[in-house]
Amino acid sequence: MSTCGSLENSDIQVQGAENGGTSQKGENPVDEGNVGETKSGDIKPAHMDEEPKKEEEEEEKAKLQASTLDDGVNISRIIERLAKEDPQSLAKIYSLMKSNNCLNFYPLLTPYHNIERIVDILIEENYEHENTWCVHCDAVFICQLLYEGFIPVASKQKVCRMVNNETKVVKECLLIPKIHYVRSCMHPSEIHISRKVKKKCKSYYITVDKDFDGVLQGIVEKHGQNWLYPFVQKEFKRIFEEQVTYKNVRMHSVELWCDGFLAAGEIGCTVGSIYTSLTGFQRKNCAGTIQLCALAKLLQHQQFDLWDLGMLLPYKKTIGSKEISMKDFFKMHRVFKHKTAPFRVPFQDKLNCGILINGTEDVRPEVNAEMHSE
């Protein structure tokens, strides 16, 4: 279900897109050449009036098929709505498609789509890629994507734009919501914890939602902006602070501390009893693994049913993550997102990772004393 054919077959002409936008259907005349005579035994060539008739039949067939689609997945109707209600975004869509041919082969998503139905279609078509794309990068739409099981990452693509009567190449922001043909997931109880982690974890504390900005800074410091561009950070922060809410989607930060130093952390989100790890960092050797192991125990303690780790990578497999097909993932996701699970450090604002990972035994005496004093 590529974007290319759907948009090019639309009758809408975009105001504001380069070169007057995309041509309307039927604008180019049909070439009419001389048709040879039919001889006995020869293949009969099409008559001059049969080609337009064939095109009309195909057009009517396409319209009939389109009329059976829900408005939430009918791209022609969505384009009509965009043209009336959000022409600036529609012009941006055409400009990006014109300058970046690869976008023609990925599904376009907008706030006007029925996202759940789009997922069903991708599963039915056995969609083997991981990318979709959209130009709407606001917090509300990001929440909607998270609720439906997408992992929204950001990108910047080159487009040509007229500036002071000169054509200039600029970079346009867009989202690349990931759907993943194979997902890395696990139940929190399936975590694999090494002896090294069990030994080192006693010196670390875990917190939740204590330093969102610090975690963002750590991620950019470690990985560069990568996909976490400033405009995405801004929208994530709005979701985190609940300036924007959508159903039960919540944005969180997880911090790992060592002697007051932020040693590792991640940004994640919860939807019902599902926790999704979005991106993270570490500043000390092994700190990232300790943070993940402590997080798994925290999720298990608070009865989360699914830990979504996104794309499968070797380190995720090492801690126990499994490969799950797109179909199976969304089957589980649509059940667990309607359940309830709290996400916080229990009983206090911070917790020693030795307590979470090893239990109350084999923890430094001062930690035991602290726990009993709470």
Where do the protein language model's features map onto the residues?
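Asparagine-rich low-complexity intrinsically disordered tracts
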Residues: G20-G21
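N-acyltransferase acceptor-side catalytic subdomain
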Residues: S2-D11, K25, D31-G33, K39-E374
